[in-house]
């Protein structure tokens, strides 16, 4: 017997209209908490029949506590926009949910989401051990914005190492020989790959790297500015010369360091990574590695759909 919206509404303790809004993913009509409650009740009642396409893809925001993945930040909003456009092209809806890395039960539940045909996992904060939790999922999935060498997993990510190599080489070609690295206090795999590219570029041009020229800051503009300002004051008090140029792990860090140096009247060039929109309007201007976030999102959707169609 087919489960009705009225039955779901009664079991969930909500109105039929709320059930309809939840099942049709109408944004802004009900809270995310209520939507997830309704979907959970619908699943328990057997509303979603296994073996049939639902026309829905779930985007899983994987939270490992690094505060990197924030959907209101330009990089991730553009990436998600690309996913939404990709889903629209294939006549799918995108539903967003969030899981914490320490919530093993919630992670295991993802493998049995009968409302979704597949998962796009925002893996920016995922470490190797986190990816291991998904390896044997039966539901099709693709991990986005991260990559490891691992069987039974599909990844869609940019080449972080090569991108950082090229932007570092750009500074070297301009004649800079003492180049500092502005790293993140929140370490993720993408940043590790970028550091490898940075070091490789220096090594290929017979340039050494002084560990004292690696600065760690929060990967957000406000906190990063304060961190970099403290570094500048410390170096000044100790009488230590600053590098001739800096490479930053991403544009947020680059913009933070530029702001701090502008306040101190220090005109040292900085290059960034990701090409977020606000970087185009920075003063002084910021050279950065261009990343087509929307295309990355569309490619991820195409890769996922190819796994089950």
Predicted stretch roles:
Residues 65-75, 96-104, 156-166, 182-230, ...:
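Hinge/beta->alpha junction and helix N-cap segments in small-molecule ligand-binding domains
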Residues 229, 233-309:
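Flexible loop/turn connectors
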Residues 20, 53-69, 178-184:
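Short beta-strand segments enriched in small/hydrophobic residues
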Residues 41, 82-86, 133, 193-205, ...:
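Alpha-helical structural signal in soluble globular domains
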């Amino acid at each position: 017997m087919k489960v009705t919206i009225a039955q779901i509404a009664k079991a969930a303790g909500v109105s039929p209209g709320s059930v309809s809004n939840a099942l049709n993913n109408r944004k802004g009509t009900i809270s995310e908490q209520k939507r997830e409650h309704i979907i959970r009740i619908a699943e328990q009642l057997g509303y979603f029949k296994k073996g049939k396409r639902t026309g829905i893809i779930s985007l899983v925001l994987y939270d490992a506590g690094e505060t990197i993945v924030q959907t209101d930040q330009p990089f991730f909003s553009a990436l998600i926009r690309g996913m939404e456009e990709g889903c629209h092209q294939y006549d799918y809806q995108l539903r967003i949910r969030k899981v914490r890395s320490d919530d093993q039960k919630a992670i295991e539940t993802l493998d049995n989401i009968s409302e979704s045909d597949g998962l796009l996992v925002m893996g920016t904060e995922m470490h190797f051990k986190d990816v291991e939790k998904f390896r044997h999922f039966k539901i099709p999935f693709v991990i986005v914005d991260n990559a490891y060498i691992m069987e039974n997993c599909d990844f869609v990510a940019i080449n972080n190492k090569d991108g950082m190599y090229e932007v570092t080489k750009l500074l070297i070609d301009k004649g800079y020989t003492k180049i500092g690295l502005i790293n993140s206090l929140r370490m993720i795999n993408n940043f590790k790959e970028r550091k490898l590219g940075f070091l490789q570029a220096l090594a290929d041009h017979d340039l050494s790297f002084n560990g004292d020229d690696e600065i760690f800051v929060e990967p957000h503009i406000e906190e990063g500015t304060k961190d970099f300002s403290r570094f500048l004051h410390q170096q000044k008090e100790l009488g230590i010369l600053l590098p001739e140029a800096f490479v930053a792990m991403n544009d947020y860090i680059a913009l933070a360091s530029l702001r701090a140096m502008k306040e101190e009247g220090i005109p040292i060039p900085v290059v960034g990574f990701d090409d977020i929109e606000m970087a185009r309007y920075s003063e002084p201007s910021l050279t950065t590695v261009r990343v087509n976030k929307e295309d990355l999102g569309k490619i991820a959707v195409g890769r996922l759909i190819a796994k089950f169609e």
